Every structure is written in C-alpha cells, then in structure tokens.
Regions:
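C-terminal beta-signal and adjacent terminal beta-strands/loops
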Residues: 117, 570, 575, 631-637, ...
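Structural signature of Gram-negative outer-membrane beta-barrels, strongest in the C-terminal barrel
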Residues: 236-240, 350, 369-381, 416-536, ...
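Gram-negative outer-membrane beta-barrel transporters
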Residues: 436, 533, 552-639, 694-698
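Acidic, small-polar-rich N-terminal luminal/periplasmic segments of exported/outer-membrane proteins
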Residues: 31, 35-176, 180, 515, ...
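Face-selective signature of the C-terminal outer-membrane beta-barrel domain
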Residues: 297-320, 341-454
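Outer-membrane beta-barrel translocator/receptor signature
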Residues: 140-143, 154-233, 239-245, 295, ...
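Acidic/polar loop-and-plug regions of large Gram-negative outer-membrane beta-barrel proteins
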Residues: 215-219, 231-238, 242-304, 319-350, ...
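Membrane-embedded beta-barrel scaffold of Gram-negative outer-membrane proteins
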Residues: 300-306, 310-316, 320-326, 484, ...
Length: 699
C-alpha cells in the first residue's frame, strides 16, 4: 500500500482543529462544575494524560515547554502504557520527523531524526550513553521519552545535527507503591515486571525504588528470538530541603538471534521465481546468538542556594559488552534463488565515564530579566572491537536447507581500540528584554581527542580537534497562547577512524535555521509547527569501492515541516499526533567518481506521521478505556531501491478495577505487509499483526 502523500497531514489537521475546538467547548462547559466541585479526578487526568506543559530535562531549565524556542516532543508514560509500548522504537513511532526501526528487528535501536542518522545520539537522564544503539534501551524503566530535534551541541557537545533522544528514568517517589504485571502476546511473548517504591523517611524525601523485567519472545521469522533480563534499583537520599540526591543503577542482559531481513529481489523488487516467504530465516539455526550486557551507575545532585541560584551535577560510569555471530545477505546469484551469505563474528567491549555540571540563576540588567546557565561537561569512552570474517555456504531462498558449515579464521580481521575523550564549556542566557519578547543566546567550545589503535597491525592514529558552536533564538508571546519563534544553531561532531589510505577525517559541522510557533489552548492542549533548513557537512558514509572503510562526502541537506498535537480534552478524551514532511538529499558529494548529488538520503520518507486517540469512560462504564490510531510512512529509497509507503492501524482496550489492571492491544490490526527500511543487500521487514495482553495488580 502506498500512502497518499498528504492523507496523514489532512488527518492530523482535522484532529488539531477538533482538539482546539473541543478544548474551548470543554473548558466553557466545565467552569461551573469545576468551581462547584474541583474533584481529584480532574487533577489525576492532568497528571497522567498525554499532554505535557511542564519544563523538560532536555532543555536544562525550568521554562515551560510552550515558551521554549526549540522543537522538543515529550512522550509520557501514559501514552506508552496506552499503546503497551515495549521498545524505544515503539515510543518513537509517535514523534514527527523521527524514523525508527529502519533496519528491522535486529536487536539494536536504529533511528533517524530530520533525515539524519541519530543512532549515536541516545542519552539517559541527560548523559550520553556508551555504544549507543548496540545494546537496546529498556523502555519499561523510563518515565518518559524526550526528543530534541535539530542541533543540540550547545548543551550536549558532540551530537549529530538531526537531534537527540533523552530517556528519563523512573525515580523514587513520595508515595508507597507496589505493582506486578504479567504479559502474553503473539510469537510466544512472555513478560513479567515489577515496580516497587518505598519511602524511607518521615518526610518521604528519602525513598527506594526497584524496577525489574524479564522477557522471552520468539519472532515471525523462524529461529529468531529475544531474551531480556533487566533490574534497576534507585535510591533518593534526604540531604536537606535545598538538596536533592538520587543514585541510579541498572543491569541488563540480552540474548538474541537477530532478524536480518530478506533479499531485495523477491520482496520489494520483482523476482522471476516468485515472492520470498516473509518468514524465511537467512542465517543458520546453529549460529552463535548475540549476548549483550550493560551496567550503569550514576548519580544526580541538585542544590538550590538561598540567593536563587542552583547547581546541577550528574555523573555516570557505564560498561557494556556484545558478542555474537552475524550472518548477512551478500546478494542473490544470477539465478535469483541462491543467496550468497557472509558471516561476521563480532565482539564489542566498552567503558564510558561522563559528567555534566552547570550553575543556573536569574538576575537583572536594567529592565532586562536574565536566566543564565553556565556549565561544563566531559566524557571519555573506550571501545574494543574484534571481528572475524567467516565463510558461510549459500542458501536456496525458495527451498532452504540448513546445516552449512560456518568457517571462521583463528586470527581476527579487525582488532581495534578506539578512545574518545572530550570536554566542553557552555554558556546560555535567556533574556526577557520586553514583556512579550525573549532572546536566547548560547556559546560553547569543545576539545576532543580521538585515538584509534589497530592492535593487529600495531598501528595507531590520533585526531585532535576543537570547535566553537552556538545558537540564538527569538520568541514572541502574542498574549493569546501563541508563541512564534525563529532560531539558528550549529553543531560539531568529530569523525573517528581512517580512510583506505590511512588518513584521518576532519570533523562534521552542522547548521540549522528554524521558524516555528507553539500554541497552548487552555491548560491541556498544545499545538506546534516548525519549518527548518538543516545542513550537515563532511559526512562519513560507506566507501562504495572498499568494504569496511568510509569516505567523507561534502554536504547533506534536510528541509521540512513538522506538525504536532498533544491534548487531554476532558471527559476522558486524549489525543497525540504528528506529521512530518522531510526532503533530505545529498547536495555535495565531495567530487566522488560516481556522483550522488540530488539523491535522497537512504531510508528517509518524505511524508510520515502518526495519530493516537484514547477515550476513558465514566459513569456506568467507569474503569474502561478504548484507544486506537494509525502510523504511516510514504515511499522512500535505500541504496537504489524503492520502498513503498504504508499505513497501519493499532487499537487498544483497557479496564481498571480497584487494584487490578487489564490491557489488550492489537498492532497492525489488518496484518498489512510492509517494509521499514533497507541495507545495501537486504530489506527490513515491518511487524505483522501482533496481539498483546497484560494483567497487573497494585498492592
């Protein structure tokens, strides 16, 4: 199915108009009732709905989201629970301008923001992660997901210009809470989780929280499976009324055989032999599964001085490991039925230390009100990578016979150590220079040291860089809840590694200009629109002539528009949706022999979007809720192939009775066959119809 180019935009537009009108009507009709009887239920809906007006951690300020001249989308826990989202990919399907799961069910977090790769831009509690997407994040342990779109180097340093994803961990609370959930689903999904919170002091400021999860699941593809174990104790200490201190820890183990997609011919492209079965496994049933583990130990300290200034300090130590055998498609033979395969025995081992510290305070210069943020951050990461290229026999994709030998050499083809150390200082001033005008100015300087060591060859390369980046934004308050703004921001990202000649790469630089507007309708509806032009220069891509090496191309450009809506409309109705138009192309290929100027960037649809509605019943049907929505992507291209667009529909039904919670969700309700993206020699499969059922109890 090819999505009509503007169908989702029209759908979202109608939803936005409906939400704005419904909010006005609901507000007008609710005033007498709210005045006469301000019930706790209304407050609970506000706290647990889809809409978020509160300040976000990603902005490093206490400014309400509608008054922030940045494109930030917040996916709250209420929306995640309504959809029974199990993975970060599930959560990001709700965010306009984000393309998730481009490489299918391979066990990693793959994402693109505003047309630019962002898999290395994953943050947890405001601190960068190690190895980024190689160990998939555990969504159950997160309270909400914040996505900052556009260059974020001012506050976060070395970040690719498309944006970043910041996951906010569940933290100890002030109320006792114990919850256990059990879940079952399609393809043998079995999941159990617990979430416990216990105050430890009379004022409940000291508290302990424990979250844990165990999950086993098979896959629509034969021989593919996923096993996950995760636990996260967190401790809040009472260090006085002016100081907050939280210790956050987690440990995760995952074992899986990844889904590697299918050959292009016979799936997306025609094949004279017919269609290839979507359940085909292109690896070997006896291959070594992937095993990954990840440990985190972090703390967050916030102190409020008596002069109105505040100090924030956070740090984390993280270790991860990943090893396993990859069997990948190497293309079909001329008979278009014999799949040539290659194997890669992989082992990654990484360590990361990261910290961020900043002071923040308000002061006046004449009639101008300033909010100044001055900070410094640093990180150091070590990553060892050992790989061996293995020989694997061919496979008849129409009549597969498994059991071919896998021959791996005793000497690895790659044995490298990469060390990245970086530090930066930043300064941001939010200036209210008139009652309705604010100006945001920021400047940052980074120093970066990268060292790559080829332990097999005994060679070593160094790449030391420094860069100054910044941002500026102007926002106007119209007085009617509408806040138009204009902004410009730059980014910096050091390129690691060498080309086939052994030469190091210069750093990437990005720049974005954005025009937008944010609107608050009442207290529980927010709408936003953003138009942007983003340029990314000196971008690394795979060398088309030398496998395993990279080249730097001249420039990529993304232009687009994004619409967003989040609303809790009263009477139990909530809405969350977004639409994006993204035009992402190569504008300068650096003079490559085979020109790519004008080509669309891989796996980026021009049109994409989603919409989710939920209705929580009252009166005789109190406790029941029903939800549903759609998510869609238009046609996109990948490595010279066309991937058709799609639209899939999801639905949910939930019931709550005192301490018991029941939820039933159906994803891809009409079992539409679709594809999410592609690699050079394989196309990634979308998820078929999936049924999820869960039961939980509070005690």
């Amino acid at each position: 199915m090819t999505m009509h180019p503007l169908s989702l935009a029209c759908l979202l537009g109608m939803a936005i108009c409906t939400s704005a009108h419904a909010t006005d009507v609901a507000a007008a009709s609710a005033v007498p009732q709210a005045t006469a009887l301000p019930t706790i239920e209304i407050h609970a809906d506000t706290q647990n709905g889809f809409h978020s007006a509160a300040p976000v951690q990603t902005d490093k300020s206490d400014t309400p989201l509608a008054q922030t001249p940045l494109s930030i989308t917040v996916v709250r826990r209420a929306l995640l629970d309504s959809q029974q989202s199990l993975t970060l990919v599930d959560a990001l399907h709700n965010v306009s301008g984000v393309v998730a799961n481009t490489y299918g069910r391979r066990g990693w977090d793959d994402l693109i923001i505003r047309g630019q790769t962002a898999s290395d831009a994953l943050f947890v509690d405001g601190l960068r992660t190690a190895g980024s997407n190689r160990v998939a994040e555990q969504l159950f342990g997160m309270q909400q997901v914040e996505v900052l779109k556009g260059p974020a180097s001012l506050l976060y340093g070395q970040v690719l210009p498309g944006g970043l994803v910041n996951l906010i961990s569940k933290r100890p609370g002030t109320e006792p809470m114990r919850r256990v959930d059990l879940g079952l689903g399609s393809d043998g999904l079995r999941q159990g989780s617990l979430d416990l919170n216990q105050p430890l002091s009379a004022n409940s400021k000291a508290a302990l929280r424990l979250t844990a999860l165990a999950m086993n699941s098979d896959d629509p593809t034969e021989h593919v499976y996923f096993r996950s174990r995760w636990i996260a104790p967190a401790l809040a200490l009472d260090l006085g009324e002016r100081t907050d201190f939280v210790l956050l820890t987690s440990y995760q183990e995952r074992d899986y055989i990844r889904q590697q997609g299918l050959p292009w011919e016979g799936s997306v492209d025609p094949n004279r032999n017919g269609r290839i079965d979507r359940a085909l496994f292109t690896g070997e049933p006896g291959q070594t599964p992937y095993h990954s583990h990840q440990s985190r130990l972090s703390y967050v300290l916030d102190h409020r001085f008596d002069n109105g200034w505040s100090l924030h300090h956070a740090a984390r130590w993280q270790a991860f490991g990943l090893d396993g055998l990859l069997i990948a498609s190497n293309g079909l033979a001329p008979d278009l039925r014999t799949l040539r395969r290659t194997g890669m025995q992989q082992a990654f081992d990484g360590r990361t230390w990261v910290q961020d510290t900043y002071l923040q305070g308000d002061f006046l210069t004449g009639s101008w009100q300033h909010t100044l943020t001055a900070g410094a951050d640093a990180f150091k990461t070590w990553e060892w990578n050992v790989q061996s290229t293995c020989q694997v026999g061919t496979l008849n994709v129409y009549a597969p016979v498994y059991g071919r030998p896998i021959v791996c050499p005793t000497t690895p083809s790659r044995d490298t150590l990469n060390v990245v150390a970086s530090g930066g200082a930043y300064l941001r001033d939010r200036i209210q220079f008139a009652p309705d005008w604010q100006l945001l100015l920021g400047l940052r300087h980074d120093l970066s040291h990268n060292r790559s060591e080829d332990r097999g060859a005994g060679a070593q390369t160094r790449n030391d860089t420094n860069a100054t980046t910044g941002s500026a934004a102007l926002m106007f308050d119209t007085g009617g809840g509408v806040h138009p703004y204009a902004s410009v921001a730059t980014s910096f990202y050091p390129n690691v590694g060498t080309d086939v000649q052994g030469a190091t790469f210069g750093p990437e630089h990005g720049r974005q200009v954005e025009l937008g507007a944010k609107m608050e309708v009442g207290a529980s509806t927010s709408l936003s629109v953003a138009l942007y032009d983003l340029r990314r220069r000196n971008v690394l891509q795979n060398d088309p002539l030398h496998d395993g090496y990279s080249i730097a191309v001249g420039e990529q450009r993304s232009r687009g528009v994004e619409l967003n809506a989040a609303a809790d409309l009263g009477s139990g109705l909530s809405l969350f949706g977004g639409y994006a138009y993204t035009d992402a192309v190569v504008t300068d290929d650096g003079g490559q022999r085979i020109s790519s100027v004008g080509q669309r960037l891989n796996n980026v649809p021009r049109h994409s979007g989603s919409l989710w509605l939920q209705y929580a019943a009252h009166g005789a049907a109190d406790g029941w809720s029903i939800s549903g929505g759609a998510r869609a992507e238009g046609e996109k291209s990948a490595y010279g192939h066309r991937i058709p667009g799609y639209m899939v529909f999801d639905a949910g039904l939930a019931y709550r009775q005192r301490h018991w919670h029941y939820a039933l969700n159906l994803k891809n309700a009409f079992d539409h066959d679709y594809f999410t993206g592609g690699l050079q020699r394989a196309v990634a499969l979308g998820d078929p119809r999936t049924l999820l059922f869960s039961v939980g109890v509070d005690y």
